[in-house]
Every structure is written in C-alpha cells, then in structure tokens.
Amino acid sequence: MDLGSKPLIGVVHLLPLPGSPGYRGSIEEILDRAISDAAKYQEAGFDAIILENYGDFPYSKTISKETLASFAVIAKEVGREISIPIGINVLRNDCVASYSIAYSVRADFIRVNVLTGVAFTDQGIIEGCARELAELRARLPSRIKVLADVHVKHATHFSSFEVALLDTVERGGADAVIITGSRTGSEVDIQELMLAKKISPVPVIVGSGLNPRNIRLFWRYADGFIVGTWVKEGGKTLNEVSLERATRIAKVVKSLRGE
C-alpha cells in the first residue's frame, strides 16, 4: 500500500468469530459477509481494506486459538477474491496475532491500537506491545507496515498527545500513526490532527468519523483515511457496506487527488 498517495482504506467489520461470545455457529456466514463487503470496497474504488474482528465484543486483550485460526482462514479467502491490499487488526490489542495472520496470508499492513504506553479501556488496562511485535518482526521479517493509533478511541490516556505520538514512532517503531475521535464513528479533533501532521516523522492517517464532507476538511493534514461506519447501510457500523455510500466517498477522494 502506497502511503504517499493518501490511500482510502475501508474497514471490513467481521461478524463474531469462533471463540467470541456472539459467535452464531456459521463460519460461512462470516466469510460471505466479509467477501461481499471487501468486493464492494474494491468496486467503489477504495485503495485497500482492513479486516477487524469488530463483532467479538466484549473484547479480550488477546484472542483464543480458534479465533486466530478462523480469522486467518477468512483473511486468506478474502484475499483470493480481491486485488487491493489487505490489512489486519485484531482487537483489542493482539499485535502478535495481527502480525502472525498478516504474515501467513501475505497481508500488507496491520493496525495496533496501543503500541506503546498504557490505555485505560473498557477491557481494563492495556499495555503497549511494541517489544513483542519487534521481536516477532525480527523473527519473521517482511514488508508488512505497522499502523499504530495515538490516544486510541474508547480509552483514557494520561500521557500528552505529543509525547505519545513521538514514543509510538521513535520507540515503538510505527510506520504510520492513526488519529481518531473518542469513539467508533466519532470525528477527529482537527487541532489534534494538525499537531500530529506538524510533529510526526511518519505518515498520519485519520481513523474514524469520516464522511464526504469532512474528508475535504482533513485532506491537507492527513496522509491516508480509514473509513468504516459512514459507508455502512444506514451509517450503522455492524451493517453491510453500502456500495452507493462507498462510491460517493471514493469519488470525493479521487476528486481531491485530481484523478
């Protein structure tokens, strides 16, 4: 994935996987939805997708073996159906599982919610996993990029935003940073985004609350965009991707690029 072209990344929110409380007993249902959503993103003109076990709430800090195995199978099958890059995000913060899946299915990037520092979340206290991820990357070298949140949503943070960002890059090894609002679907603080763009030595990606209106506002301050909630039917996170909505926002991005 080319982070120099301001990529538009669509989120495939997976239905509850085996091992999670909400699993319905059908991997085929999960796979069919994932392939359908991914195909719509590609048809709409998105540059990449990211698979996320969003339906597995309440989340554990690390995932079970059955969840990891099913996630990997689904990611592999989705990859066979589309040609755009794929990313992996294992909630709540299982960066080792994310990288392991990405490595095995030849994905292009992963997202890590808490790479460095500490976050106080609805799952309890989550500590950064930079060391574990760095060791795994050393054992399994690849071109997989690490996109890491700074002051991730659904969490309280006590370090300053500036310190957290610089630590995420300089000590955590992030290839890009992600800035979000306070919750899924919440718009980012433009002042925070502007600060991130000013001080970050790596690309800055907007990771929540995007729509065709505000993506124009954020364009000059961001190097990429992750879209999930707005492109769903009715703007509801757990619904299927709306091809019409996905196409609308993709057309805005292409217009801003001058394509």
From Swiss-Prot:
This is Uncharacterized protein PYRAB10620. SUPFAM superfamilies: Ribulose-phoshate binding barrel. InterPro entries: BtpA, RibuloseP-bd_barrel. Belongs to the BtpA family. It holds the Pfam family BtpA.
